[in-house]
Amino acid sequence: MNIERADFVDRVKIFVKAGDGGNGCVSFRREKYVPKGGPDGGDGGDGGFVFLRANPSVSTLIEFVNKRKFVAENGKHGMGKKMKGRNGKDLFIDVPVGTVVKDAVTGEIIADLNEPGKIVCVARGGKGGRGNAHFATSTKQAPLIAERGEKGESRWLELELKILADVGLVGYPNVGKSSLISRISNARPKIANYPFTTLIPNLGVVKYDDFSFVVADIPGLIEGASEGVGLGNVFLRHVERCYLIAHVIDVSGYEREDPVRDYFVIREEMKKYSPFLLEKPEIVVANKIDLIGKEELEKILKRLRDATDREVIPVSAVTGEGIDLLVSKLASIVREMKVEKPERKEERFVKPSPVWRRLPEKFHLEVVKEDEGYWVVEGENLRVWIERFDLNQRDARLMLLQVLEKNGLNNKLKEAGVKEGDVVRIGDFEFEYRE
């Protein structure tokens, strides 16, 4: 799979907003011969959820460069005859397989969409409000009250793509990684005799007998990459998922003088990015052996084996010498590690419940003086009531004031110094204080 530089994006931020719940309805049954039909206001529909879904046909995050805001549909309002409003449509956003989803504010990892079809809910829709049919009692048979729908969740997300490959080719620029991947796989990357020809990771599928595996050509690293020198080390995130690292070294002596030093410089840059990378299985691929004499090659190979304590496989990506042995070794290691990996049990996706906060019955009230003769009643739990009900509805005001009085509202007003005739505001509702 080859991706053009302009189309390769592996980290973006997006904003997601779930749908709000629809409002409940205030309605009364009106039919011939039914003079006292009673309340029949229906409930509002639930707001749509926002999901991210791993889609194998999507290869980069380029689609999110120009569109960063995603909003699900709101639930419809309830209607008379106890008709519930329609639920808002859920919004599914397709991302590449291998996308890590983080909360952009806290940095918390929400999900790793590392398998095709895997789904995660990133914003829950709000539950629809209840219609007045729910508020009828033996003493209140015609309630003029209904609930507003809950607000849907919203958040900023950071999406980070980590390419899924079995083998990662790492090394200095121009050591022949692109030539190597084109020799062993179906990948056809740009190849040229200058550093940083590869600007994005290239993927290739390698077939060996009845087994196939994926190799990633990671853009070249140089000393100081962790400080941003060259292309930096940001592409190393794509090695994190690999089973095996194939460290490509130029042993020709034409462009790189000391293969052993090169090996440890790259290892140090990998360590600075993530010490975890050094724990991965690794083989050393000594490339460009066609450009060096046999006697000199043997000396270099011995130095590499002694210094690295790794298996060193000499190859020439140009002539093909040693390629069969390399592919056989890569396939053997990857096959063995895939067998050792515990089988993942298929997870059944269960849609979570919509946002719904219980109406609190206890309040920590605070009376704040905003101006001479003008006061505001505040409180964390009070916010839920204010958002849930339309206080322009008389019955909603009465119900809230009754609950507040049980929590000592009158005493709080007196303690704050509220005088008769002063204006008190609760949410959008204002009233004149009377003792």
Curated annotation (Swiss-Prot):
* Cofactor(s) it depends on: Mg(2+)
Q: Which Pfam families match?
A: DUF1967, GTP1_OBG, MMR_HSR1
Q: Name one GO cellular component term.
A: cytoplasm
Q: Which residues form the OCT domain?
A: 357-435
Which parts of the sequence bind GTP? Answer: 171-178, 196-200, 217-220, 287-290, 316-318
Annotated compartments: Cytoplasm
GO terms assigned for molecular function: GTP binding; GTPase activity; magnesium ion binding
Membrane-crossing residues? none
Report the EC code(s) recorded for this entry.
3.6.5.-
Q: Which residues form the OBG-type G domain?
A: 165-335
CDD domains reported in the protein's UniProt record: Obg
- Give the EC class as a word: hydrolase
The residues that the entry says bind Mg(2+) are S178, T198
What PANTHER family does this protein's entry cite? DEVELOPMENTALLY REGULATED GTP-BINDING PROTEIN-RELATED, MITOCHONDRIAL RIBOSOME-ASSOCIATED GTPASE 2
HAMAP family in the record? GTPase_Obg
Q: Give the record's family classification.
A: Belongs to the TRAFAC class OBG-HflX-like GTPase superfamily. OBG GTPase family.
Q: What is this protein called?
A: GTPase Obg
What is the protein's species of origin?
Thermotoga petrophila (strain ATCC BAA-488 / DSM 13995 / JCM 10881 / RKU-1)
Chain's gene name:
obg
